[in-house]
A protein has these predicted regions:
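Flexible, active-site-adjacent loop/turn segments at secondary-structure boundaries
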Residues: 41, 125-127, 216
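Short amphipathic alpha-helical segments, especially helix-boundary/capping motifs
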Residues: 10-13, 63, 141-147, 230-231
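Conserved nucleotidyltransferase catalytic core and NTase-mimicking acidic/glycine-rich helix/loop elements
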Residues: 146-277
Length: 277
């Protein structure tokens, strides 16, 4: 309860500051604290969109970040192609993390148009500060999750072959006692395994599946059986256990990929697996 109280106090300080800052026109809370999926806990972050007249100016100076509490560290992520606005990921004393997005008025103006809410806001949002009456124009959140699409056959086959390409190297590295290199390859294999688990969940369910990024909530959306098998795919930093984990990883991937191919009516590259496994 102490962590939740500290988080609430920090949120209140951010809100008070936003009210008194002329540059800030709106403050929007997103994330688990704005959704209705019951996933809020003591470790939940604060996700705040600061809608400002001059977000670029705010991004150039961190002084405002220090107004809300004792700052431990700040991760600066500037706007790039896949990210329209700069973000500042801040950890405050007490272990409270706040993800600030510094956006211009266009962020809300676009969603107030026929384009509608983006997937983040569609899951749930709360207007904590609204100086320009955006609430009148923004659609209400539906609290629905975005629907993930299956890849096409070409991409599926390419990714399966990429997995077996990576798998080809691991036994060789282990034979050379290059454990770190083996683990690095295994890391790429795990990324491809997660992708296949996602595709498997989509393929076997007729209804949309709420798949989160980076495997969050995987035990829920992938199922207990896959969760149990997945645990065996992680090994210790020794050759013997790494080999065991490698066998578990390749076995799980092969099974899931074959099931996806069968459900979708796609071919499976058996010859590639036989040659590289």
């Amino acid at each position: 309860m102490e962590a939740e109280s500290q988080r609430s106090q920090l949120a209140a300080r951010i809100r008070t500051w936003a009210h008194g800052n002329d540059n800030v026109r709106a403050l929007v809370q997103t994330g688990s604290l704005a959704r209705r999926d019951g996933l809020v806990d003591a470790f939940s972050d604060l996700d705040m969109d600061i809608i400002a007249q001059d977000p670029v100016g705010m991004a150039k100076n961190d002084d405002w970040i220090h107004r809300f509490g004792e700052v431990i560290t700040i991760l600066h992520l500037d706007a790039v192609d896949a990210q329209s606005w700069p973000t500042r990921l801040v950890i405050y004393a007490g272990g409270i993390k706040v993800d600030f997005t510094l956006a211009g008025l266009a962020r809300l103006q676009k969603m107030a148009s026929p384009a509608g809410l983006d997937p983040l806001y569609e899951r749930g949002y709360q207007l904590l500060v609204d100086k320009d009456a955006f609430a009148k124009a923004l659609p209400a959140a539906t609290y629905r999750f975005p629907v993930h699409a299956m890849p096409d056959e070409q991409r599926f086959l390419a990714r399966v072959e990429e997995f077996w390409f990576e798998a080809f190297h691991v036994p060789r590295y282990l034979a050379r006692d290059e454990l770190l290199l083996a683990k690095q390859r295994d890391g790429t294999m795990k990324e491809l395994l997660l992708e296949m688990i996602e595709w498997h969940a989509i393929a076997r369910h007729p209804e949309p599946v709420d798949i989160w990024h980076l495997g969050k909530g995987i035990r829920h959306w992938a199922g207990e059986a896959i969760w149990a098998e997945l645990q065996a795919t992680y090994g210790h930093f020794d050759a013997s256990d790494a080999r065991r984990a490698y066998q578990a990883t390749t076995a799980l991937y092969a099974r899931l990929a074959r099931e996806v191919a069968r459900i979708q009516g796609w071919p499976y590259p058996e010859s590639v697996e036989r040659a590289l496994r």
